[in-house]
């Protein structure tokens, strides 16, 4: 509970509290943009309406309701029965949705709970945080596009720690360079001037995709390999040679197989020889690729 200073202190402290433990902040700033302060945590913001400096007929009501709300969250408790054999994280994007949906369907049939994270920056950050909190048994990282945004200054960067949590925690992971053919920007007018002349595609009115080039793919491939080389647990890399997104398949606006090959070759040349690399002459959204990804992660989980 607080005004400006108190709110920032409270929200900062709440970052250390694991997801699932109730968190509520009654604040005069609750109607402001506190995106950065809330971050990836499950924090409930409640407007105080009046200043919290003293008690009055309005503040008494709202403080009582805030106390009731947090008590209600605590009393809700946790599910008593485990409803799945394990939890698997999976990353997705519009360009990899068919793949992720099929993988999810197949894994659910095996009794797993599958949680999808949209690779728009906060999605990757949240997934990494939950992995570190021990929430997941394995990761099917289909869509690693946030690495490209971090490299090129796109709007979907998840920061430098993307693709590190599973490696540090030692849980099984199958990694795919999904959507590393693109960097995300807002409206066409927001694309930095340094990228003028590059291949751009308007995915939506306020979403512009930029095709990654060979030089960027060298950096991305090396970065991915170096992060995976530090894995404490089992990891495999799965490469769809005929397209790493919907728009890079044959006939797609980003179809540049020679540029994708630079990415594949760089990953393979920098990856620890003990880490298996499976190459498939299919697009990322084809059924055989989806089945292979699921088979790999299930085989790891059985060990």
Where are these regions (language model features)?
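Metallocofactor- and cofactor-centric catalytic cores in central/energy metabolism, strongly enriched
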Residues: 1-168, 173-176, 185, 198, ...
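A solvent-exposed, charged loop/short amphipathic helix patch at secondary-structure junctions
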Residues: 191-208
